Structures are given as structure tokens and as C-alpha cells.
Amino acid sequence: MAVVPDVSAILGQALDDEDATFAESVIAAIAHDEAIVPALFWYEIRNVLVMAERRKRIAAARTTAFLSDLALLPFSVDDLPREASVLALARRRSLTVYDATYLELAQRHDVPLATLDQALMAAARKEGVALFKPSARKADTR
């Protein structure tokens, strides 16, 4: 089954001080099927990694290698989030528009959302969107 990962879900694969176990499970799920992401995902991940470089959390060479590895995975970019739905989710669940975009994608495609963001997880639960479970690549709607 496809998954909608946000950046927090896979950062652990690049940054030593993030959750590597969860990230490895998400990346394995993507490799097995596919990830559906908004176009902003690629800008967001690059920004987070460059900021991490500035804070000496990652070397530039590691950023380049990580992005190259990600490019080999089956990512499907959904360029057309439904603006009205995204804005409604952001307002209703007090999310950033960025986070609401990931939630809207998971909701519309009826696939699990992979995130470590607690507010986004809570919003997904309230909206009835399944969350990615690393243990068996299953979803949890609790």
C-alpha cells in the first residue's frame, strides 16, 4: 500500500539524532510500493537538511548522498492539492497549510500518513486518516 510521508517520517535516515527505526520502516514501505508526496516535500526536505548542515548536524556530502538515495525510490508527486480542502483542514485542526497538505493527500488517496509530528498525528486521527505503523506496515486509525 502506498503511503504519504512527511519530512519528519524519513529524516531519521539522514540525521543521527532523529528516529532512525521509524524512518527505516517508512523507507522500506516506500521501496515496496510508493510514496505520494506534495511538490513541497522536495523543497522542505532540502531546506531541513541545509539547515541541519548549518547547525553541524549533518555533513554536506551526507545530504547529497541522502537526496540521491531518496531519488531512487518510487515517489509520486501530487501537484494538485485541493486548495479548499487544505485550507479547511488547516483551519479546523489548527495546522500549518504545509501539514494540512500532507493530511489532505492521505485523506484523498485513502492511504496511511507517515509522520512523527504529534499535532499532525492528532489531526489525522480526528479526520479518520490512517497512520503508518512501522511494525507491520499497517495503518492505525486510533
Regions found by a protein language model. Name each.
Residues 1-40, 52-61, 127, 140-141:
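Short, well-structured N-terminal submotif of metal-dependent ribonuclease cores
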Residues 2, 95, 103-142:
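Acidic, PIN/NYN-like endoribonuclease modules and their adjacent C-terminal/linker elements
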Residues 30-33, 51-55, 70-74, 89, ...:
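Alpha-helix C-capping/helix-to-loop hinge sites
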Residues 39-42, 62-93:
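Acidic catalytic patch
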Residues 56-68, 119-126:
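Membrane-interacting alpha-helical segments
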